[in-house]
Amino acid sequence: MSRPDKTPRALIHWGADRFDKAGLVYGHGTDNALDEAASLVLHTLEIGYDQPDTVLDVEVSETDYARVLRLLEQRVTSRKPAAYLMDEAWFAGMPFYVDERVLVPRSPIAELISAQFSPWVDPDRVTSILDIGTGSGCIAIACAAAFTQARVDAADLSRDALDVARINTARHDLEGRVQLIESDLFSAL
């Protein structure tokens, strides 16, 4: 397969073509090759999704070009989810650090949290929240952001997962509101 031009747009299309030919599986943040390639290219080049399309046609440096090609090839050869390659996943409109110590956040619960579980829950009456099996802490942190008056307990059996959740509570400045607890289900609660 020939190398692409040195623009983000060309790199995205080249990556998507490589992903399709490799038969990659998606579902950890994206659901198709083009979105997955765009996510990796834009992340590597630090291009925000809110940038005008014209930035996609500007040539990148040799160094950045090589970095992008390496990451796209790594996605094909390792078959690891893009979130693990970028150390980042989005949940409920918020970025989270992730690595292989936790599952990649992907849940329809994000939409419920963003809507404060309306119409089933009165947000003013929520004072405490428990997230069991917190992993990266994404559900607990998104709940803390949505229910600002609530105390949130986030429990997990895995110390490794709690270490990742700790990174995320600090990233979102919620150390004082989200308590991380090592617990096998309810054993330490």
Q: Where are the regions a protein language model picked out?
A:
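Short helix-terminating capping/connector loops at secondary-structure junctions
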Residues: G29-D31, D122-R125, E175
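Conserved SAM-binding strand-loop segment of SAM-dependent methyltransferases
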Residues: D173-L185
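SAM-dependent Rossmann-like transferase core, predominantly class I methyltransferases
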Residues: L56, A66-T148, V152-I167, E182, ...
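N-terminal auxiliary segments of SAM/dcSAM-dependent transferases
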Residues: S2-F91
